[in-house]
């Protein structure tokens, strides 16, 4: 058997193991290293692709892309039988033959937007990998991941690690106190409305000082900025965060303390993000911090569908797919695939190169 035949046989075994996936899903699953962006329509199985990709990373590493021409005859015979359906699936033997640099589950950070989606991801991983391995994968929402980071490191920002997290009712009550502090009426500045503007500012990574600077001579904007500053002072005095602070302060932590960022960059060399079209600037920046800024070709895998964005009211930026702020550095021609055709297209990409798949 020639070297090329050995490589082809190994890759056919990969395709057999992941035969429940279509061709485009398999391409996404087997592209382990480097940045990958997948556009997937509703019902196209994007969550299935993410789950299968994590399984492939843990079981086989980069074995598909880096398959070599070495294959003992006994293994070649068994692989062919497996491909032909004459041998039962033996994951351990497949791993022994096919795996190259398998990835440790605790080095994978898988992010989604809702607790329900994160729970489904963990459950599906457990059904394939087993409870113990699946529990080692860091599958969570943006906010859950950031809370864990802040519990360990927020003292660097002047908070205690046992900080409270205010819900919407807590935030409104606090804003009423802030309105009293600056001697303006709730009728003129409804607490809910003010909090919504502050929330949008945090999602856009705008500080109270920046908001005040942007206000110019506009009285209402100046008062909102002032209330924003007073609100943050009260939160800090109470050792509390609101919901928006969770990601906002995590990004601030990483920007002010590069040594803390480095810990998480090296802990999570592989990052996967589902429903990325729903991300706003602060979330995009968080992912860029962890996966992008220190590395030439970050191992980040993003899946989404611009037509399904449901968080525009929170400044989600589905236009990311066309021209996002943190992918403007360079351009290149990169391979783009769909079910019915393959063609070359100019795509803005993460840093130096981004593989780009369309899954319909």
Where are these regions (language model features)?
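Conserved helicase NTPase motor core
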Residues: 9-42, 47-51, 70-78, 82, ...
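Coupling/switch/interface segments within P-loop NTPase motor domains and analogous charged loops
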Residues: 169-235
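A substrate-engagement module of RecA-like helicase motors
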Residues: 67, 73-91, 98, 153-181, ...
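Post-Walker A helix-loop "phosphate-sensing" segment adjacent to the P-loop in P-loop NTPases
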Residues: 56-66, 103, 130-131
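Conserved P-loop NTPase-based nucleic-acid remodeling module centered on helicase motor cores
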Residues: 105-196, 319-323, 351
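Glycine/alanine-rich phosphate-binding loops at beta-alpha junctions
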Residues: 3, 44-47, 56, 62
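Coupling/hinge elements of helicase-like and P-loop NTPase modules
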Residues: 186-196, 208, 213, 332-360
């Amino acid at each position: 058997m020639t070297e090329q035949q050995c490589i082809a046989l190994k890759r056919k075994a990969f395709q057999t193991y992941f035969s429940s996936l279509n061709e485009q899903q398999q391409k996404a699953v087997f592209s382990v290293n480097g940045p990958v962006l997948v556009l997937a329509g509703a019902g196209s199985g994007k969550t299935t692709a993410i789950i299968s990709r994590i399984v492939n990373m843990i079981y086989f590493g980069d074995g598909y892309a880096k398959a070599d021409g070495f294959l003992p005859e006994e293994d070649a015979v068994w692989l062919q039988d497996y491909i032909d359906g004459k041998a039962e699936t033996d994951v351990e033997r497949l791993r022994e033959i096919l795996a190259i640099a398998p990835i440790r589950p605790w080095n994978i950070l898988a992010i989604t937007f809702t607790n329900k989606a994160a729970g489904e991801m963990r459950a599906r991983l457990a059904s394939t990998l087993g409870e113990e391995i699946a529990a080692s994968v860091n599958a969570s929402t943006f906010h859950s991941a950031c809370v864990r980071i802040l519990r360990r490191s927020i003292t660097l920002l002047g908070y205690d690690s046992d900080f409270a997290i205010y819900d919407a009712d807590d935030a409104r009550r606090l804003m009423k106190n802030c309105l009293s502090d600056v001697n303006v009426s709730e009728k003129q500045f409804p607490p809910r409305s003010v909090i919504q503007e502050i929330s949008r500012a945090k999602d856009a990574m705008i500080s109270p000082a920046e908001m005040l600077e942007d206000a110019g001579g506009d009285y209402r904007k100046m008062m909102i900025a002032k209330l924003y500053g007073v609100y943050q002072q009260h939160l800090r005095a109470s050792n509390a965060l609101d919901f928006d602070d969770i990601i906002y302060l995590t990004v601030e932590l990483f920007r002010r303390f590069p040594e803390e960022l480095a810990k998480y960059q090296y802990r999570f060399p592989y990052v996967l993000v589902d429903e990325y079209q729903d991300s706003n600037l602060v979330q995009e920046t968080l992912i860029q911090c962890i996966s992008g800024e220190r590395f030439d070709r970050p191992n980040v895998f993003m899946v989404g569908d611009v037509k399904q964005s449901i968080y525009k009211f929170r400044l989600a930026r589905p236009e990311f797919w066309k021209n996002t702020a943190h992918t403007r550095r360079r351009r290149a021609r990169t391979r783009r695939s769909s079910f019915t055709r393959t063609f070359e297209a100019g795509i803005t990409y993460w840093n130096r190169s981004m593989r780009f798949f369309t899954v319909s």
